[in-house]
Amino acid sequence: MKDLIEYIVKAIVDFPENVNVTQIDGESTIVFELRVRQEDVGKVIGKKGRTINAIRTLLNATAAKANLRAMLEIVEEEEQSS
């Protein structure tokens, strides 16, 4: 499931090298934390949240096959100063 999220998000964003997905396992729930650059957050969320909702729908369908519950959270990275 982690690979699925990375594959989809890297295809959408301008900075695919900055996409990072962390998996936190619970008893029956898996939480995925998605980190992208601040410039890419809008692209991942999409107009009226349609893009992130579509990704979450795919994630939930995949998790349901394994009798699990999955959640996807977007964590914004801080701007890196040079």
Residue ranges and their predicted role:
Residues M1-V41, T51-N53, L58-S82:
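RNA-contacting regions in translation and RNA-metabolism proteins
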